[in-house]
């Protein structure tokens, strides 16, 4: 009856109220299902490792390569320079090496 009265005032108001009621009922009924879907304690992952890590072995059992400590890099010769390095601006000024 209330829906009929709302429909007389505004045609879409009754439909909107009806859809909101259906949505509210559906949401209220789905709440208990969430607690049933929770993972049991027996299947939860352990918080600590059962064995301590041995060295630096990764997941595949391979030791990672560590780069050797390098000192200052030697200056690249003109033939070894890459395009992304850009031009050496010190070549353009006569007093750069003073």
From Swiss-Prot:
It holds the Pfam family Frey. One of its GO terms (biological process) is sperm-egg recognition. Its main location: endoplasmic reticulum. It comes from the Eukaryota. GO terms for molecular function: protein-macromolecule adaptor activity. The chain crosses the membrane at residues 13-29. The keyword Repeat does not apply. This is Protein Frey 1. It comes from Homo sapiens.
